[in-house]
């Protein structure tokens, strides 16, 4: 099974971009999310944002950008938002592929499209973006060390030998999206997804991606806090 369904009303002849949903967790990103969605929809017209209890105008800005918005009444965490978004997108019978995509401008649609095309042309269930397959992504020393530690721990715990275990840019076919169970609401969902790849014996590959650490994301202290969250995930799970 390659994730495509040959007898489904000619879906194979439909451009891959139109058979893909972007799943975008959203929390207090009103400043940038409209531009991110408008840019992404130039390639992928189907975008669902899960507003995870934002206290700003994130939901309105995402809608203005052309996304479908599903809202959590309170902040549940990124894992919960991904689960809600995948559940929504799986309800589209014409959808073959699902991409988890950040709302703050760090992910590039060019990378997402390459990953989806890999799913469409190769016997794969899931493609994980990696910042370590080339030198385009500029990482701080502490971030690089933490991510390398994450790789070691994930290999030991799941047997899945990724080079970048905590990259949020992922492309899944329908089989993978239906098979992976996300019970961890917050940052531990990243490790959970890797474990689910091993548990379900999903066919996986990595693709080089360029993650853009912008002035905006740095101003929020995201890189530092993500490193702390990853360490907490590794040692407390």
Predicted regions and their residues:
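Short beta-strand-to-loop acidic/aromatic patch adjacent to the donor-nucleotide binding site
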Residues: 94-104
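Acidic helix N-cap motif at the loop->helix transition within catalytic regions
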Residues: 31-35, 56-65
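Acceptor/aglycone-binding surface of glycosyltransferases and processive sugar-polymer synthases
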Residues: 68, 73-88, 97, 109-187, ...
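Conserved sequence signature across two-component system core domains
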Residues: 26, 50-53, 72
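A conserved acidic beta->alpha catalytic loop
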Residues: 51-60, 105
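N-proximal low-complexity "stem/linker" segments adjacent to membrane-targeting elements
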Residues: 1-39
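Short loop->beta transition adjacent to catalytic acidic/histidine clusters or analogous donor-positioning motifs
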Residues: 17-21, 39-48, 57, 67
